[in-house]
């Protein structure tokens, strides 16, 4: 993060447009520098840092224009460094043949490839918050595990969790049933040091484990197939159906950014696991701000990018659409006129719900996009959605999917969850 600042000498003097913004991100960044001039020794910290956010606060003083010298600022050269990890990975020992591997959406920062390799060697059922990165994951686990009966039938001996699970209460309820929990997350060495588990690893360990028994695998397959049958039978242009169809029809080799709140949870639950798509999401504070800008930044490095946003996420970052770069990104905006996730939570129906939680805006996202010079259309059917996903992504476009009301969606989800008790 680069921030522009007034000279330090003006701080705490009441000077205009001057505030305390040094170390504004606190311990959330790996490195901070308060840069007070063109000569600053940044090569050393840049070469030695682990991956993570960096904050450079750059002080600007008069004169604002360069002098007569053509080269008034030396180039910063950051050479690639190779660090040898002298510590051998620890070994994970387990006699369990009824184990489960649970993979959080961000994988604790570990690469998809390394986690896939680990999962294949382990040979346990996989629950993945990002089913588009793990084709061997159990389909729709967060849906059928809403049933307490099914959770009781699938109590594991051991669960291994990679990263953090932040999307579904059903998955977290399932995790609590396991007598032994193993956590793998590099962030425990930095920002997540209080994480509780029976065993903790900050890197993928060497495995000394047993494969899952055939009977255990068959149990998971049974519930996944029964749940998939129910999901395949869903009709209409609902948020669940949209998530299912987006996952199934994204072009091979495309990139997907998915916003927080309901979109990422619907994809987790209703998408059929597959490969061929590179997925991204903001799972730090999981906010709805900055999602357009994040998607466009990702699209700069991708051939064709799709971004799935809720209407509030879209409205909170409209200025991100003001750009001068050539970017290929198709935004699919799920429009239910407000914060749909809150209608699925216990506070639904309390006094003042709409003004505090629902926050309806009564705006037309497509009209707003057009006013900003962006190509925009509105769709209301699965066929139109499939057509959108098959079309080449050229430039920036907005496709607004108008869906049933937030209450209707919440009732539909509740009915789906309740039906899991009888599959």
Each predicted region: which residue ranges?
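Structural signature of the thiamine diphosphate
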Residues: 1-2, 27-74, 151-180, 360-423
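Thiamine diphosphate
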Residues: 2-28, 271-423
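Glycine-rich, acidic loop regions that bind phosphate or pyrophosphate groups
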Residues: 4-43, 128-224, 324, 345-346
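Structural motif
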Residues: 35-38, 57-60, 102-108, 129-131, ...
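Glycine-rich phosphate/diphosphate-binding loops that line cofactor/substrate pockets in enzymes
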Residues: 45-50, 89-99, 118, 245-252, ...
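Active-site donor-nucleotide binding/catalytic segment of nucleotide-sugar enzymes
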Residues: 93-109, 217-237
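Glycine-rich, anion-gripping cofactor-binding loops and their flanking helix/strand elements
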Residues: 103-186, 190, 273-304, 315-319, ...
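Active-site diphosphate/adenylate-binding microenvironment
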Residues: 221-302, 421
């Amino acid at each position: 993060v680069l921030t522009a600042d007034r000279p330090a000498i003006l701080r705490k003097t009441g000077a205009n447009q001057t505030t305390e913004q040094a170390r504004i991100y606190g311990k959330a960044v790996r490195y901070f520098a308060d840069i007070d001039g063109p000569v600053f020794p940044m090569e050393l910290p840049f070469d030695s840092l682990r991956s993570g956010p960096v904050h450079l606060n750059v002080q600007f003083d008069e004169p604002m224009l360069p002098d007569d010298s053509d080269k008034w600022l030396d180039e910063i050269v950051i050479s690639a460094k190779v660090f040898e990890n002298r510590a051998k990975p620890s070994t994970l020992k387990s006699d369990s043949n009824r184990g489960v591997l649970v993979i959080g959406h961000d994988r604790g920062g570990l690469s998809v490839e390394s986690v896939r390799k680990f999962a294949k060697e382990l040979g346990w059922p996989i629950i993945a918050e990002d089913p588009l990165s793990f084709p061997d994951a159990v389909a729709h686990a967060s849906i059928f595990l809403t049933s307490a009966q099914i959770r009781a039938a699938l109590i594991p001996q051991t669960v291994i969790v990679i990263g953090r699970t932040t999307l579904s209460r059903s998955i977290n309820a399932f995790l609590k049933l396991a007598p032994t929990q193993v956590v793998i997350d590099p962030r425990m060495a930095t920002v997540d040091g209080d994480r509780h588990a029976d065993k903790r690893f900050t890197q993928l360990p060497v495995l000394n484990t047993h494969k899952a028994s055939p009977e255990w695998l068959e149990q998971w397959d049974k519930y996944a197939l029964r749940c998939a049958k129910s999901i395949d039978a869903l009709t209409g242009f609902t948020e669940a159906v949209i998530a299912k169809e987006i996952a199934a029809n994204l072009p091979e080799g495309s990139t997907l950014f998915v916003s927080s709140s309901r979109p990422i949870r619907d994809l987790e639950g209703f998408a059929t696991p597959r490969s061929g798509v590179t997925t991204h999401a903001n799972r730090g504070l999981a906010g709805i701000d900055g999602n357009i800008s994040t998607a466009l930044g990702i699209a700069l490095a991708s051939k064709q990018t799709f971004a799935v946003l809720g209407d509030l996420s879209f409205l909170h970052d409209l200025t991100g659409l003001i750009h001068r770069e050539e970017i290929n990104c198709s935004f699919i905006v799920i429009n239910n006129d407000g914060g749909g996730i809150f209608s699925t939570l216990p506070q639904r129906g309390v006094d003042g719900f709409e003004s505090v939680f629902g926050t309806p805006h009564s705006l037309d996202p497509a009209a707003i996009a057009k006013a900003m010079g962006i190509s925009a259309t509105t769709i209301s059917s699965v066929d139109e959605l499939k057509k959108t996903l098959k079309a080449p992504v050229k430039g920036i476009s907005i496709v607004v999917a108008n869906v049933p009301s937030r209450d209707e969606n919440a009732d539909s989800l509740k009915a789906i969850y309740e039906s899991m008790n009888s599959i």
